Design a protein with these regions (language model features):
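Nucleotidyltransferase catalytic core that binds NTPs
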Residues: 1-68
Length: 68
C-alpha cells in the first residue's frame, strides 16, 4: 500500500490544490491532506473552516482524508 501526505495552509483551497489532490489520489492508495497552521501568518479562514471546505471538496475521493 502506498500513501502520501499533502500538507498546506489551504487558505483558501484553490483549483491548484484540488489538481494536486486529484492526481495524488490516482497515484497513491491513500492520501492524507493536512491543514496546517502557522501562528506567524494571518489567515482569511480558521483551520476548522478550511478543514470543512477541503472535506466537502474531496468527499468523492474514497482514498483521501483531510485532517487538522
Amino acid at each position: 500500500m502506498t500513501s502520501a501526505v499533502f500538507p498546506g495552509t489551504f487558505d483558501p483551497p484553490t483549483n491548484g490544490h484540488l489538481n494536486v489532490i486529484e492526481r495524488g489520489s490516482r497515484l497513491f492508495d491513500k492520501l492524507d491532506v493536512v491543514v496546517a497552521y502557522n501562528p506567524k501568518k494571518s489567515y482569511l479562514f480558521s483551520p476548522e473552516e478550511r478543514l470543512k471546505m477541503l472535506s466537502e471538496l474531496t468527499k468523492n475521493y474514497e482514498n483521501v482524508s483531510v485532517h487538522l
